[in-house]
């Protein structure tokens, strides 16, 4: 994928999670909520402050993140793959997969 977001923008590929009902039935389509987790594919150079200083982003390519769905998050199709374009401000957390396993 050849895309470079500007400033504090981040390109994220949504990571689908299997949703199950309380009874163990796998939910698909509209019955399952869209995941708010994804993998960062590309990041901009950083937020430009009023004094012209560039503040680097906290997220990096390969990070698994939890993001806010809705305003500010735009879905695009690039190279046949659906990705999300969002500001770093729309990312609420970086998931440390190693810590979850332990």
From Swiss-Prot:
The keyword Magnesium does not apply. SUPFAM superfamilies: GroES-like (SSF50129). InterPro entries: Chaperonin_GroES, Chaperonin_GroES_sf, Chaprnonin_Cpn10_CS, GroES-like_sf. One of its GO terms (molecular function) is unfolded protein binding. It is found in: Cytoplasm. Together with the chaperonin GroEL, plays an essential role in assisting protein folding. The GroEL-GroES system forms a nano-cage that allows encapsulation of the non-native substrate proteins and provides a physical environment optimized to promote and accelerate protein folding. GroES binds to the apical surface of the GroEL ring, thereby capping the opening of the GroEL channel. This is Co-chaperonin GroES. The lineage of its organism: Bacteria, Pseudomonadati, Pseudomonadota, Gammaproteobacteria, Vibrionales. The gene is groES.
